A protein has these predicted regions:
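Contiguous, well-folded functional domains in the mature portion of proteins
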Residues: 1-141
Length: 141
């Protein structure tokens, strides 16, 4: 099996997925990955690929990379309940994106002020197709 490396789509502090407070993410049930704690408010594409899903609430985005990796970037925990408030999308579903391209912006202070965590899981949803998955903070620099 091929090993892969994923650069972080956000600036912040990289933490193990097991430290995310939502059990669906922490358990790995939604995919293998890592999370970014205390993120700044910009999400960039960690890969060249295509936007496969952009939630209407703009809190989560899926990307299929040019080399076959399926990623889900989910800003915060339970932030779907904000119904798009404090989020701005810079891409649409079906768009081709380049590594480093701005995807989403969000206001982490406003989200936290409304009582939501901003820790952002970054998941490989087709992780069974890969061996070791390494996450780095390189992409968000």
């Amino acid at each position: 099996m091929q090993d892969i490396r994923i650069d972080s789509p956000l600036k912040g502090r990289l933490i193990p997925l097991s430290e995310v407070t939502d059990p669906a993410f922490a358990s790995g049930a939604m995919g293998r990955g890592a999370a970014v704690a205390d993120p700044e408010g910009r999400v960039v594409s960690p890969v060249d690929g295509e936007v496969t899903v952009l939630f209407a609430t703009k809190h989560a985005i899926g990307i299929h990379s040019a080399d076959g990796v399926d990623l889900l970037i989910h800003v915060g925990v339970d932030t779907v309940k904000l119904e798009g408030k404090h989020f701005t999308s810079h891409v649409a579903q079906g768009d081709t994106v380049q590594k480093g391209q701005l995807l989403l912006e969000f206001d982490p202070d406003a989200i936290r002020a409304e009582g939501y965590e901003t820790t952002t899981p970054v998941l490989v949803t087709n992780a069974a197709d890969y061996g070791k998955i390494t996450f780095t903070l390189d992409g968000a620099e």
